[in-house]
């Protein structure tokens, strides 16, 4: 997936060295660059449905601790555009996501922020702690903060649960190559106007972009920003009512028809939205070769 170390080390699929896969006809295959290379290509970003993976072999990276910064700001469109621009050009070691949202009633936020529209910048800097403090400080200095938390923590601490569950959600996903004042204003207006939406913006680049688009089934290597719009509701049926508004806002914040497969809804055109035509054709060929009867299917 696309995580907090991706700008520095690449996507998770870029560190996959090999896999053992049971195919539809019962064979156990060793799959890597030299053995079953087409299947290995498809496993890296293809979304599944190709076999049963019984073992994965990954390249590992030693990460002792990271600098984590969680900074909350007033929901200002000019600041949002500046934040996204700054973080998109940051060093590869600094990963980030920027949320425009209504602060949820979770334990790690003080009660005075609960229910308040905010911009949240989540920063993760792997490597030298002093450099991490400096990079977080550059973001802190962009505007007065409502709340800030900066700490040295194990990388695993960044991946813990956020403490809220039991709600319905509908998402829209895209990629953007620019995020200027107009798009920032759309994002801020959507949240401050009372709609229960979260706009999530994730700078890409770095090591993600240093892999050829056709090297794996994830072809969107050169995109600058991943965008995710989510509508939250007490139950899924209520959330589904917001789907048209989610799709409209997602399209306004994105460039082109594509979105990150992990955040796309299971709609009839999901595959066409996740993969460019050439990638989708190659995936279909791999599927036909290894599972012609479509034994493995989720849709």
Each model region followed by its residue ranges:
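Soluble FAD-dependent oxygen oxidases
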Residues: 1-299
